[in-house]
UniProtKB/Swiss-Prot annotation:
Region entry G4, spans: 136-139
Compartment(s) of residence: Cytoplasm
A cellular component annotation (GO) from this entry: cytosol
UniProtKB keywords: Cytoplasm, Elongation factor, GTP-binding, Hydrolase, Magnesium, Metal-binding, Nucleotide-binding, Protein biosynthesis
Protein name as catalogued: Elongation factor Tu
InterPro entries membership: EF-Tu_GTP-bd, EF-Tu_GTPase, EFTu-like_2, EFTU_2, G_TR_CS, P-loop_NTPase, Small_GTP-bd, T_Tr_GTP-bd_dom
Amino acid sequence: MAKEKFARTKVHMNVGTIGHVDHGKTTLSAAITSYCAKKFGDKQLKYDEIDNAPEEKARGITINTRHLEYQSDRRHYAHIDCPGHADYVKNMITGAAQMDGGILVVSAPDGVMPQTKEHLLLARQVGVPSIIVFLNKVDLVDDPELLELVEEEVRDALAGYGFSRETPIVKGSAFKALQDGASPEDAACIEELLAAMDSYFEDPVRDDARPFLLSIEDVYTISGRGTVVTGRIECGVISLNEEVEIVGIKPTKKTVVTGIEMFNKLLDQGIAGDNVGLLLRGVDKKEVERGQVLSKPGSIKPHTKFEAQIYVLSKEEGGRHSPFFQGYRPQFYFRTTDITGTISLPEGVDMVKPGDNTKIIGELIHPIAMDKGLKLAIREGGRTIASGQVTEILL
C-alpha cells in the first residue's frame, strides 16, 4: 500500500512527557492519543504499544524515548514519551534535546520526587523553553488542602530550576481519561491540557536558514530499501536526492538521501524541527551510528579538542559533593552523543568546586561534529555534574 503524503496544515511542534517513574507519563501519553483519535481521527496508541520493548513491558517502565503524534485545534504535535527510570536518563537527555515544550507529570499522592527535580534540571540544561504540569492521580487524594500543598511544592520546584511559577497546572486522572467509555468529566482534563499547550507553549522558531544538520538518534535497516537514520532536524532543510555527509566518530562519508518520512508519511523535504526518518543510498547499517550527524557537505567538521565555558552544579542542585582536578575523565554529552573525555583546567587553577563557573579544555576519545556555541552536559556516575557550551575549537 502506498504511503500517504504528510500535509503541513498546522504548526508542527515537539513536546514530551517528563517526570518521576510511575507517576503516569505513559498513561497520560496514551490518554492524549486516545482523546485526539476520537476528536480528529488520529491514530490511537494503547499504553502497551507505547511501552513497546520486551524489557519495558516486563518491567512496566519506559526505557527508550517513544515518538507519538496527534493534533490539537491549533497544532500538529510530535510527542516524546520520556523514560523516568534513573538508569535511562541518557535517553531522556536526547529526547529532551528535541522538545519545544515539556509536560511534567507529577503524581498527586506522591508529590515532587528526586527524578521530578532531575528531569526539570535536564529540561533546563537542554533548553526546553517552557513546561506545563499535569497533576495526575488526583482522584486518589481526598484532602483539598493536601492538593494545594503539592501544587505549591511543584511551583517551588519549577521556580528553583528557572521555570515560571505561573506555569499552568492541569489536574486529573490519566488512567480514568484513558478508559473506554470515559465520562466527559474524566476526559475534560485532557481537553484542558491540550488547550493549555495550544495557548501557553509559544510557536517554535525554526532555524531553516543555516545549513542542514540532523543529529542521528537511531539507525534501522529496511529490507529491500536500505539504511534509515532517524532524528530531529536541528537546522536547515533537506530535499529528496540531496547529497549529505555523515560526520563524527568514524571517518566522514558522503551519501544521498533517497527517502524522507515523518510518522510513516512521505515528505518531499524535511525542515528544521521535524522528527524524520531519512533513507540513505549505499550505506550499510554498520557504517552509521547514533551520535553522528548528517549535514550539508562541508558545513561541519569532526573535532576532538575544544575550549568550553561550564557551570559546575552545586551539591544542592544534584551535582558533585567534592571538587574535581586536572585530568578528570567524565562523560561528555553533545546532542545525541555521550563520549568519554579528559578535562584540563586553566593555568593557575588546581581544582574546580561545585557551584563554580570556569573555562576548561576538553579532549574526547573520538571526534564528533562540533562547532562554536554547541551546548554540552557533563555527567558522572548517573548524574549531571556540569553544563556549558563550546567557546573555541582547538583540534
